[in-house]
């Protein structure tokens, strides 16, 4: 790590991932991997997405791995639907099933509880909360720009 700020960001991100994974596991939201959860969240935010759109957000993951993950969400877990576009049969779109929407809502509820607990435990003053929110909005903007995301303010 180049400096203390980078180390702190890494350490925080690692702990957040562990904390969320443990809370989601406790809630029995479903036996989902990180990648499966992220795909559900992406499709939930953006609506129908092609498999290639989803894959473009994972540049270091092969298209076959993304496709296999989506097939598992579709065939085994019944959380997404796959549909071949009639006008271009080379394109398969993915959308959430009703079961997928329910699982996603439970994931969001669990995450809201986790982040709510963390926010309260920080003991920030109203001014600090406002500043913290600005920092988070800037970080979100950076990641959206870097990843080419357009999640409509989500």
Locations of regions flagged by a protein language model:
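A structural signal for well-ordered alpha-helices, especially hydrophobic packing surfaces
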Residues: 13, 17-20, 104, 140-144
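Terminal interaction helix/tail motif
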Residues: 109-154
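Conserved segment of winged-helix/HTH DNA-binding domains
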Residues: 6, 98-117
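N-terminal helix-turn-helix DNA-binding core of bacterial DNA-binding proteins
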Residues: 21-62
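Short helix-coil-helix linker/hinge
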Residues: 30-36, 97, 122-126
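Canonical helix-turn-helix DNA-binding module
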Residues: 47-92, 98
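N-terminal leader segment of winged-helix/HTH proteins
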Residues: 1-31
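A cross-family signal for key residues in well-ordered alpha-helices
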Residues: 41-42, 105, 133
């Amino acid at each position: 790590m180049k400096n203390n700020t980078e180390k702190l960001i890494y350490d925080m991100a690692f702990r957040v991932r562990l904390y969320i994974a443990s809370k989601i596991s406790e809630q029995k939201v479903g036996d989902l991997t990180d990648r499966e959860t992220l795909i559900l969240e992406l499709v939930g935010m953006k609506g129908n997405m092609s498999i290639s759109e989803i894959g473009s957000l994972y540049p270091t993951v092969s298209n076959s791995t993304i496709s296999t993950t989506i097939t598992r969400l579709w065939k085994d877990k019944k959380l997404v639907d796959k549909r071949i576009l009639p006008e271009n049969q080379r394109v398969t779109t993915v959308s959430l099933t009703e079961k997928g929407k329910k699982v996603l809502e439970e994931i969001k509820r669990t995450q809201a509880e986790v982040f709510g607990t963390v926010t309260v435990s920080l003991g920030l003053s109203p001014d600090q909360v406002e500043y913290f929110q600005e920092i988070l909005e800037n970080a979100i903007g950076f990641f959206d720009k870097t990843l080419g995301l357009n999640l409509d303010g989500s």
